[in-house]
């Protein structure tokens, strides 16, 4: 049986990055022996070398690095060169949703996007002289744009079966994927799979097997969901809630939700609660009616506000609830006054129980090698945006600079990028005292022996990594992994 190692590379401890485990699961189903190594960014170089020495054998064909949005730390860079020096016959593969923004002559192949189909094609290529399509825009890197050339969507089997050698502990939160793609097409979104028409969600039996297996092996009951919009389909929610009803343990899940759908479809609240979805991340974006309508979120703002308060009260009466709200400053027709009015409402109404509101300045990528451009990116002039005459002081602070090749330094008739960034920074300073633990970080506190009710009351910066509990877990994991 052919063998490979896949390292999970990201900077968030103690999250187990889903990508490497998903690729490993898919390869195992195709006859491979794959071992995943988590938290690789936090291993020392010598620990990584010793581990590899203990695992390499004559059937080892490649070593992969699954990188969270291009994360490529120094220890991994040095490790890749060491691998190429000591094991030149073994291929090195980089996988991520973003193109590499670094140079590394030791990497043989790069996959960008959802890569289940691409990795099978690639393995056949370098082992059996098969055919492969590389991205011809790159002369010095062999890159496969998986979403275009070997699309792994739609896909109705998205489960991951973990192995005992993954050394998962019962307090951990794993990531689960129900469906791939979003049925909506918000004008600011550059996610590559938008406007999905049909239900391609994973089968109920697949979901049941996945969560039962994780519980039976490790005692895990808590999950982050990878779906772009968890509540986009009523029948899908009911399907999984019916499975949850049959389990002899209670699930807890956190994920991305559309608040307007929740408000309009109260009949989804019960199945969501039965499924254990009490952590909600809402992309509200704006409380300006004209702005919301222009980007695909046209529900009346007053109805949204009233609905949010009702949602919080209903879910929190059953289990400790966390509702995170994201707002985007600078969308079409948003004025400084309407923006500040919306923030004022959040400050007054959405900080109880530590509910957190995150604000972001609008990013308008003009070019990107690794993602689709949004409607706003493709139509920014028609939407009233212009290039700033005076270069912005804040362009470097906008997060997509890590992923986009060029961002628009924008202004319109209402504000500019610099004002938007400064406004968001000011808002953060004002509400950070009241910020609770984000929906994506409840798992960080699993070793603290806190009830969800107690955790709901904690502030965002409570016992953050690095801390003794997680450091002990990391070293425990590394020691056991090397000794296996």
Residue ranges and their predicted role:
Residues 1-9, 28-29, 33, 45-62, ...:
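Radical SAM enzyme core and accessory elements
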Residues 102-121, 271-279, 343-363:
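Structural recognition of alpha->loop->beta junctions
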Residues 238-245, 334-354:
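Short, electropositive alpha-helical surface patch
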Residues 14, 40-47, 71-73, 230-235, ...:
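Acidic-and-aromatic substrate-binding clefts and catalytic sites of carbohydrate-active enzymes
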Residues 98-103, 184, 234-235, 290-295, ...:
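Flexible glycine/acidic-rich beta-alpha junction loops that bind and position SAM and/or redox cofactors
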Residues 30-32, 217-218, 247, 275, ...:
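A structural motif corresponding to the C-terminal end of an alpha-helix
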Residues 1-212, 217-219, 480:
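Acidic, low-complexity intrinsically disordered segments
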Residues 15, 153-319, 329:
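Radical SAM [4Fe-4S] cluster-binding motif and immediate context
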């Amino acid at each position: 049986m052919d063998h490979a190692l896949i390292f999970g590379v990201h900077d968030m401890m103690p999250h187990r990055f889903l990508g490497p485990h998903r690729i490993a699961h898919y390869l195992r189903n195709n006859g491979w022996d794959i071992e995943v190594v988590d938290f690789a960014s936090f291993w020392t170089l010598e620990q990584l070398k010793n581990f590899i020495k203990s695992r390499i054998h004559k059937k080892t064909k490649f070593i992969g690095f699954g990188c969270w949005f291009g994360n490529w730390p120094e220890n991994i860079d040095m490790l890749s060169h060491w691998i190429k020096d000591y094991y030149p016959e073994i291929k090195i593969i980089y996988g991520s949703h973003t193109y590499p923004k670094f140079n590394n002559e030791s990497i043989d192949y790069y996959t960008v996007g959802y890569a289940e189909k691409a990795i099978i094609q690639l393995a056949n290529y370098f082992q059996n002289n098969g055919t492969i399509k590389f991205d011809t825009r790159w002369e010095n890197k062999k890159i496969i744009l998986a979403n275009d050339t070997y699309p792994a969507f739609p896909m109705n089997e998205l489960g991951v079966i973990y192995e005992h050698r993954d050394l998962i502990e019962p307090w951990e939160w794993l990531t689960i994927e129900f469906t791939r793609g979003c049925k909506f097409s918000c004008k600011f979104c550059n996610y590559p799979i938008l406007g999905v028409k049909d239900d391609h969600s994973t089968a109920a039996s697949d979901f049941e097997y996945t969560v039962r297996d994780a519980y039976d092996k490790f005692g895990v009951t808590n999950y982050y969901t990878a779906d772009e919009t968890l509540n986009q389909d009523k029948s899908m929610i009911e399907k999984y809630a019916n499975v949850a009803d049959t389990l002899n343990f209670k699930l807890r899940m956190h994920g991305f939700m559309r608040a307007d759908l929740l408000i309009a479809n109260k009949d989804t609240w019960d199945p969501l609660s039965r499924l254990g979805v009490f952590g909600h991340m809402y992309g509200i974006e704006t409380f300006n009616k004209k702005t919301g309508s222009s980007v695909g979120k046209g529900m009346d703002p007053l109805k949204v506000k009233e609905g949010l308060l009702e949602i919080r009260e209903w879910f929190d009466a059953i289990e400790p609830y966390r509702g995170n709200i994201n707002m985007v400053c600078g969308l079409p027709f948003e004025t400084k006054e309407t923006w500040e009015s919306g923030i004022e409402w959040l400050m007054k109404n959405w900080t109880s129980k530590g509910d957190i509101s995150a604000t972001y300045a609008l990013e308008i990528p003009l070019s990107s090698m690794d993602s689709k451009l949004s409607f706003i990116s493709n139509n920014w002039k028609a939407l009233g945006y212009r290039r700033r005459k005076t270069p912005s002081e804040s362009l470097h602070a906008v997060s997509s600079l890590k992923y986009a090749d060029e961002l628009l330094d924008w202004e319109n008739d209402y504000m500019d990028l610099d004002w938007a960034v400064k406004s968001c920074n000011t808002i953060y300073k004002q509400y950070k005292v009241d910020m609770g633990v984000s929906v994506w970080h409840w798992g960080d506190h699993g070793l603290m022996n806190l009830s969800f009710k107690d955790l709901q009351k904690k502030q965002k910066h409570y016992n953050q990594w690095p801390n003794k509990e997680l450091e002990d877990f990391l070293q425990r994991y590394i020691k056991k992994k090397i000794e296996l």
